[in-house]
């Protein structure tokens, strides 16, 4: 009898495949508040499982919340929140009041959702246009997102963008990297396994030796490889 595939084990929801959410510092989102406020950055902390540091902000009314920290933000810095907030690094402003060409991050899609775009380390969006009650924002992926003009965002680039420039150097560092994520590591190739462990395994060779395309309706133990692929391999003339 064959063994379960990696994705079958993950689907069961065991501890090795679950994200350790109990290690997180807390939710990082813009609070759903109205009016004008002055806040102070009281701490910048590491959030396990993410590369972007979180800034802990305390408002003048005593409210505390976390947001993804932007580059240049320091402990003790005063920030403004509200419709009339200045377009300055770290301030939380309404997207409709932001001039074209301004770099923003942690961008809400609709007001009150806390932030949906440009939240990971080193990412940002650029305001490229305004149409009625919508604002066009160019994201790091080159896609254009439409957000409400009263949605809010943080001025600046999310910190931690250089994390991928530092090499991991050894497998032990990669082990700890994946330890705080909902992923299983290391990932073993199917062709390197025994035939009992994977449909691509066995044969004393490093090739699939059969078509790797499988039906969308294949049973779970066979559904691996190029699933319902229209084509495989290089394009002609490429």
From Swiss-Prot:
Biased composition (Polar residues): 206-216
Record keyword Lipid biosynthesis present: no
Domain of life where this protein originates: Archaea
Ranges of biased composition (kind: Basic residues): 223-238
Keyword line: Ribonucleoprotein, Ribosomal protein, RNA-binding, rRNA-binding
SMART domains: Ribosomal_L2, Ribosomal_L2_C
Pfam families xref list: Ribosomal_L2, Ribosomal_L2_C
GO biological process: cytoplasmic translation
GO molecular function, one term: rRNA binding
Stretches for region Disordered: 199-238
Record keyword Protease present: no
A cellular component annotation (GO) from this entry: cytosolic large ribosomal subunit
Subunit structure comment from the entry: Part of the 50S ribosomal subunit. Forms a bridge to the 30S subunit in the 70S ribosome.
Record's function text: One of the primary rRNA binding proteins. Required for association of the 30S and 50S subunits to form the 70S ribosome, for tRNA binding and peptide bond formation. It has been suggested to have peptidyltransferase activity; this is somewhat controversial. Makes several contacts with the 16S rRNA in the 70S ribosome.
PANTHER family attached to this UniProt entry: LARGE RIBOSOMAL SUBUNIT PROTEIN UL2, RIBOSOMAL PROTEIN L2
Similarity comment: family membership: Belongs to the universal ribosomal protein uL2 family.
Xref: NCBIfam families: PRK09612.1
HAMAP family associated with the record: Ribosomal_uL2_A (MF_01320_A)
Name used for this protein in its record: Large ribosomal subunit protein uL2
């Amino acid at each position: 009898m064959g063994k379960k595939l990696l994705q079958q084990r993950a689907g069961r929801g065991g501890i090795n495949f679950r994200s350790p959410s109990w290690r997180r510092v807390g939710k990082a989102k813009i609070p759903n508040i109205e009016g004008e406020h002055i806040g102070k950055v009281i701490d910048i902390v590491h959030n396990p499982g993410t590369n972007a540091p979180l800034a802990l902000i305390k408002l003048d009314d005593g409210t505390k919340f976390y947001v993804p920290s932007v580059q240049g933000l320091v402990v003790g810095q005063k920030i403004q929140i509200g419709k009339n907030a200045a377009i300055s690094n770290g301030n939380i402003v309404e997207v409709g009041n932001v001039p074209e060409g301004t770099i923003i991050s942690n961008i809400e899609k609709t007001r009150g959702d806390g932030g949906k775009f440009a939240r990971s380390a080193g990412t940002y969006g650029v305001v490229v246009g305004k149409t009625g009650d919508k604002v066009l924002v160019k994201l790091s992926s080159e896609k254009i997102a439409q957000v409400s003009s009263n949605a809010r965002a943080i001025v600046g680039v999310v910190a931690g963008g250089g994390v991928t420039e530092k090499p991991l150097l050894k497998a032990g560092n990669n082990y700890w990297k994946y330890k705080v994520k909902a992923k299983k590591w290391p990932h073993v190739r199917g062709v390197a396994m025994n035939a009992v462990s994977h449909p691509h395994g066995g044969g004393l060779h490093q090739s699939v030796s059969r078509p790797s395309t499988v039906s969308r309706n294949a049973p779970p133990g066979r559904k691996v490889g190029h699933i319902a692929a229209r084509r495989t391999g290089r394009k002609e003339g490429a």
